[in-house]
């Protein structure tokens, strides 16, 4: 009887310890989320200014559709940029993003996927792991962008996507 009591107490202690660890992890993830939200808020003025500048350029360009980025072309090679977190401490966010990406591939880009003309740029470890396990063509050059998130890092990613489109690697 006393052995069972000791075992129950040990289990209770173990559960309490796990609860403490979980609470600490929640606090750490909340702090990181807040830091990421602050970084995004700080980038908003840059993004709106960039959007304004691009609008001015397109509207001031004679026949604006002559620009490489504005030209319409048949979709042959697809680039899908999937942004997930590095860890699973964000509720259903990663699962929802992955489901949405899979649904988009199935509904819009099934032919490109079947012919091997679909590439996924995975930003965040969870998305990279998810799509690699399922055999998708995953480019992980920006997978660790959240390790040191900055405007410069995001800018490099955006420039790479624009350059790939301009060079007609992707449509």
Name each region found by the language model.
Residues 2-171:
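Conserved loop-to-helix interface motifs that mediate assembly, gating, or partner/ligand docking
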């Amino acid at each position: 009887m006393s052995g069972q009591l000791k075992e129950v107490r040990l289990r209770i202690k173990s559960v309490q310890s796990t609860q403490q660890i979980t609470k600490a992890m929640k606090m750490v993830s909340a702090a990181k989320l807040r830091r990421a939200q602050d970084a995004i808020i700080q980038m908003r003025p840059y993004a709106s200014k960039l959007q304004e500048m691009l609008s001015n350029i397109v509207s001031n360009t004679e026949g604006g559709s002559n620009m490489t980025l504005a030209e319409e072309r048949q979709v042959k090679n697809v680039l899908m940029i999937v942004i997930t977190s590095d860890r699973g401490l964000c509720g259903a966010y990663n699962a929802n993003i992955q489901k949405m990406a899979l649904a988009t591939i199935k509904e819009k880009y099934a032919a490109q996927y079947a012919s091997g003309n679909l590439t996924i740029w995975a930003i965040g470890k969870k998305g990279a792991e998810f799509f690699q396990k399922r055999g998708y063509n995953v480019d992980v050059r920006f997978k660790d962008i959240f390790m040191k998130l900055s405007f410069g890092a995001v800018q490099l990613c955006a420039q790479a996507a624009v350059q790939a489109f301009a060079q007609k690697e992707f449509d």
